[in-house]
Amino acid sequence: VARGYYAEADVEELHRYMNGLLKPLGAEIDAFYYCPHHPEHGIGKYKAVCRCRKPETGMFEMAEQEFEVDKAASWMIGDKLIDVEAGRNYGVRSILVGTGYGSQIFDKLKKEEKSGREEEPYDFYAEDLMGAARYILEQGRDHRGRE
């Protein structure tokens, strides 16, 4: 949006399309959050420094205004380090997925690990979104010991 490739209406249409695909499967995304801004390359009103651009936590804070968020039971899933960094900044666990940029980042981090990096910047790596979902379900819905 910030660079002018898509309008906000296009993003909203994509969100409706995604929920349309999920609905027959019995799933629905309750709310979508995105940052339309870019601090350097934004056009017009979209050229802005903001709290909603990852790795800041503004989008998480927007969700807190709408929903009761249990950080202990919440996850951030993304294909870039900035995604998992945003999750860490907010205080939730994170999963790097291998789709999109994720597999390249994972391979690069594995090479760095061999050269002395101490810890992963994410809590789990999954090949794809389905793998991430399975992992989260394996952990249990309530991370305080209840199913």
Annotate each PLM feature.
Residues 35-37:
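Short loop/turn motifs enriched for small/polar and acidic residues
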